[in-house]
Amino acid sequence: MGAMRAGDPYDSGVQLGPLAMARQLERVEGYIAKGRDEGARLAVGGGRPTGLNRGYYIEPTLFINVDNSMTIAREEIFGPVLSLIPALDEADAVRIANDSPYGLNGAVFTGDPARAYAVARQVRTGNIAQNGFRMDMNIAFGGFKQSGVGREGGVEGLLPFLETKTLFLDAAI
C-alpha cells in the first residue's frame, strides 16, 4: 500500500485519485484519528500526501492490531483505509466478516479459485471478488444489510427506472 501513488487520476502512473469533497476528506481523517484513539496501529499512510495541495487527497492507510469492536472495523469509511483484523482460521474470518451491519463489498485473498468461491458464498456482501476489488458497469453493484439503497449497473440497476404496464386486448382487434 505504501507504494501506491496518489495524484491526478488522468495520470497513468497514479493508483489513487482524490476524495470527492472536503467534507469526505474530513470524515476519513476523523476515522483515522478514531482508529489511533481506539488502539489500532497505523502501519502505512494516515496523512495527506506531500505535494498535492489542490484536491482532497489522503494517503492509502493501513491499520493493524484492529479488532472487530473498533469503529474503523464497524463502519463504512468510504476512503482508502484498510483495517487488518487477524483471524484464527477461515471459519473465524467468515464470522468476523459477517459480524457487521454492513455488507457492500468483500474480497477473498487466495490463489485457489475453488477456495475463493467456497468462502465467498459464506460472506454476506453484495459484491465479492478474489484477490481484490473489481467493478464492471454491465454487472449489478450494491450491498446487503444496511449497505446501499439498491443496485447500480446491469439490468438490476435499470429496473427502478422502469414501470411495468400490463395490457389486456381482445384477440379480434
Predicted regions and their residues:
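Diglycine-centered glycine-rich loop/turn motifs
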Residues: 41-47
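Conserved donor-nucleotide binding/catalytic region of nucleotide-linked donor-dependent transferases
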Residues: 8
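Short linear capping/connector segments at secondary-structure termini
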Residues: 11-17
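Conserved C-terminal structural/oligomerization subdomain of aldehyde/semialdehyde dehydrogenase
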Residues: 2-5, 16, 32, 37, ...
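Short beta-strand to alpha-helix junction loop
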Residues: 18-29
